Amino acid sequence: LRIDGYLHPVEQCPVLTPEMTDSFKNIATKDLRHLRAQIDNGGGGDFALTFRGMARFRVAVYKQKGWFGMALRLIPRRILSFEDLFVTSHLIPRIKNMLDRPHGLILVTGPTGMGKTTTQATFVDYILESPRHVLTIEDPIEFVHDHKNGLITQREVGVDVSSFREAVMKGLRSNPNVILVAEIRDLATSEATIWAAESGHLVIGTLHTTNAPETITRFIDIFPPEIRDQIRIQFSMSLLAVFSQRLLLRAGGKGRVGCYEIMVATPAVRNLIRERKTEHLASAIQTSSSEGSISFDAYLAELFRAGKVTYETAIASAADPKGFRELVEFAQRNRQH
């Protein structure tokens, strides 16, 4: 089992044989006809599985050495609150205000397994407290949301629709206020995402990037070189914020806690994007803290001061270890005075 990012052997459990995993694969996919051929002939596939109404898993089936293996990730039953997610409580009203906007683009980014889906689920859960229609496009559907005071439509690529792009473009006809695109992975989806944000929708999307500057570069570079200048203009006008995140081991060794970099699209940030000066975005984040931006290391310092992570974990995770030390020492001197 992988617990808090590390693999742990399971004691007193029989070793799974290839025949057992193949049998489990057949049982798990018996109602997923669209996936059977892909898994059997293509060597793998991804889907969500609910077990007797008690637990829900994201399942990845893959082939190795001629036999099937599986990775099952437990999807939490409880959607986290903003207070659960963010140690920087003073930023929560700004984040909620962002999610109340009628249109624009919010990107949630980070490596695989770093909590992006959990953050998006919290965002969607908050939005549904108001009378708005939220359309989620996922592959597969992970968190299953209640309507609450709004309306939720959840579409799964490969089951309800053939692609992310098709889901976005056709989804516009279903009159959503908010569209969640669980993965922006290609040119067609990127184009549809920009179009949806420009046409009066709040769009929340995901990229597998580690920080805001890399996110901007990755998104723009998806497009052909001859139209990138125009895309920079459109993207800069639509962007509301980039949330980049990682999960760190909690102090005490049990559980993990999210560490965020938040870049709010201030006029200065929009101008840097248009002018192709992404190398200056890190400085723009530091100088726009009053607007709700926060650097990864500044957030890391907040986690350390709150006792959420140890100093050893913090210094090992810092983007700039030397700068992080100075940040912590400066805060300690201020408290003493």
Language-model segments: residues:
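Short, flexible helix-loop junctions that flank or precede catalytic/ligand sites
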Residues: 1-337
